[in-house]
From Swiss-Prot:
Organism: Camelus dromedarius (Dromedary)
GO annotations of cellular component type: extracellular region
UniProt key word Transcription: no
Family: Belongs to the POMC family.
Protein name: Melanotropin alpha
Record localization: Secreted
Amino acid sequence: SYSMEHFRWGKPV
């Protein structure tokens, strides 16, 4: 899931 936890690094991982 692409939540805020994925986007904390600046890229969707």
